[in-house]
Every structure is written in C-alpha cells, then in structure tokens.
Amino acid sequence: MIDLHTHILPPQLPDLRRLTGYGGWVSYEDESNGCKRMVIDGKAFRTVEPNCWDAEARLRDMARDGVRLQVLSTVPVMFSYWAQPQHAHDLARVLNDHIAEVVAAWPTRFLGLGTLPMQDPARAIRELERCRRDLGFPGVQIGSHVNGQNLDDLALYPIFEAAQELDACVFVHPWDMLARDRMSRHWLPWLVGMPTETALAACSL
C-alpha cells in the first residue's frame, strides 16, 4: 500500500515570534504523555502524537498497517501564506529540509512533497526549484487558496508554469476553509468544509 496523504512536522520549530517580531506562528508545548500540543499565540490548535515528528514511530505504524511507502507533506497550518514572504520562505526551507532528511534516511519508505511561500510567486518558484533540483522531491503541496485568491488567479500562473517545466506534481490540500464559524460541531469541518474547499479549488482550475 502507498499512502499519498500523510503529514509530518520537525521535532522542534524555530521561535518565529521572537525571530520575526509578530505572532500567528505555530509553537509546541510538550505534554506529559509524550505528545506535543500545537499552539498559536497561546491558543491550542491541535495535539499531535510522536508519529507526527518521529520517523521511527511512523515506520512502526506503517508496518502495523501494511503501508509500504508514505508521501510526506507538512501540516497545512504551517503554510503561513499570511506572513511576510521572507519569513514564510524561511519556514518553508526549515520544513522542506526536515522532510528531505527523513527521506534521505529511509529512501525506500518515504517520498517528500515540499511547501512554498505562495504569497510571493518569485520566492515560491525559487523554493520549488530547490525542492526539485536539490532536495529531489517529486513535487509540492499547496493550499486550496492563497489568502482568498483562488488558484486560477493570474498572479499564481508563473508558479504552475514553473511546476510544469520542472515536471513537478502539485498536491492541492484544503485549508482555511469557508464558513469555518458555522462548522464547529458534528465533524462538519471534515465532512463538509474540507470537501467543499477542495471542490472550490478544483473547479477554479
């Protein structure tokens, strides 16, 4: 079995609030059970288990579930399209380098998809080129929109043209979904919100 949709994070993240001078970034808080709580400006976002950052724990899960190969990509909240482009690019490099390290250590078990600072097409293209040429990734993961821009926005075309020239696949992942404030119950974000966001992105293209 090949699992195309798996997310991974580095075991540690840079203190981006301190480094950039503003908030909105994900940080970790260690929990007593060995998990990590993802926190944004002091507010809990999600708790992740060791298999989210520990490749050996992930390999044990793969053996249990009969998965031969995983395609690794970052957790979409890390896209950071809202941030200043240089800072988003710096974070993308950290995330992509970590994925590349995991793939290099277990090249028969993992492939990687990079992340790009999509709010700045020139930077996104540079990072896309690095992902393909230096890190050896087959492609990248991008969000279903970029700060409200649908993926058919003309400003984004150069990124897709570069992906075509580089023979890079593009995995579109839903994020920052529509009508979030109306979907707090009944698993509606996953049953309705994410599929709707994906459909909107696909139809835009």
Language-model segments: which ranges?
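Helix-coil boundary/capping segments in enzymes
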Residues: 1-205
